[in-house]
């Protein structure tokens, strides 16, 4: 079910174009006039070849700006994209909040992902205003050193044997704290609870136990991403030349900068303390202590070169909390809506974790749980078009599709619901990928953390989400505890709802489930 944006609670409504009303009567006329005059000037002064693709949501001849078209895209994007690509295997252009965007069918994804002229970092830096104070996380993401990508791709992989068990132990305590021990059936706001669970668990591995239990840091980790998304969207309403000025006048801009300042105040002393400890040990010829968290891994990877430690951590929170939460909640809800899965999943968890404990190898062996999650991601991807990138120069695909320099381009997720690829695509089949793993030719791509052209929920290598390996491990840990410790069922007469806005398709924040404590827990090897 799609929920109309006008019925959303305030924290969601603030993400919509209705936010312009919050700025008083001066805001809309000023932005409309400014944007219109600037667009007209740019159009008259522009030269070079333009795209010949049709625009799905064009502005009419009497409209001075594209504001109405952008607003319509935000409200209708998932249904428009699904409608177009269910009937057409060819590109289409849309007017989106950042300008024109060419969306390609997934049949062009293989060629798209290999094009170096299409830059994802340019998208992140441009649409999230990396040059402005408060967006420090995106400034660090888009630095030429690409330190964050290196840490996520290398350290989070090689250090997994060291962090899986302590992370599972931390998640165990957090789950008890959040979900409680009541053995009576009761309704819980599972979206909010899972968001808190992911925030606290991610923070533990990002900044270590000291900050992971600091309520002020947890509040920043949880809310900075939302503040940043709101402000980024509001700034995209304005002509580029005016955005720095507007950013200093907007209340959200002030809030964003304050969050970054406080994050630095909390994190910098820990960084300095660790560096002093390291230098002191080395001066004495002693091996410095090593911490199992991303602070350590950033220090190792930077090798003494400067980087923005606070910006890096805020970027990691932005990337690691909300996407992970959506898949965790979506996976749990899908399992609960198919209660015949509960015991087979519990049997798998008992056997695998009971025999092997918390190790990367054990998490790999949770094949049914892995299949359930990958199917949840296929049925409801987090975005209806993914791998957004900007053209660094004019680009022409082999089929003649032309993308002008500076234009946004993305790939539709249409293949994930294509009946020629997936039998009964609308059906949630939890064993779908488990069966595929029995075929040696498909076993690799059938795993949640691996990508191919038939399933781009995490993108497609080399444009895939670099944090998917960690997210896969983390989600399986949390779900294992949630399924073993608690009974679950749906709330009667409460259908599953999604929040659809622009490219995003998310589990609705008002989602609830019923639960109660079971008289069982995960028993590790050697336990009684």
UniProtKB/Swiss-Prot annotation:
Cofactor: heme
Gene3D superfamilies in the cross-refs: Cytochrome P450
Ranges of the Cytoplasmic topological domain: 1-23
Topology term for the membrane: Single-pass membrane protein; Single-pass type II membrane protein
Reactions listed under catalytic activity: dihydromonacolin L carboxylate + reduced [NADPH--hemoprotein reductase] + O2 = monacolin L carboxylate + oxidized [NADPH--hemoprotein reductase] + 2 H2O + H(+); monacolin L carboxylate + reduced [NADPH--hemoprotein reductase] + O2 = monacolin J carboxylate + oxidized [NADPH--hemoprotein reductase] + H2O + H(+)
Cellular compartments annotated: Membrane; Endoplasmic reticulum membrane
List of residues binding heme: 465
Protein name: Dihydromonacolin L monooxygenase LovA
Species whose genome carries this gene: Aspergillus terreus (strain NIH 2624 / FGSC A1156)
Lineage of the species this protein comes from: Eukaryota, Fungi, Dikarya, Ascomycota, Pezizomycotina
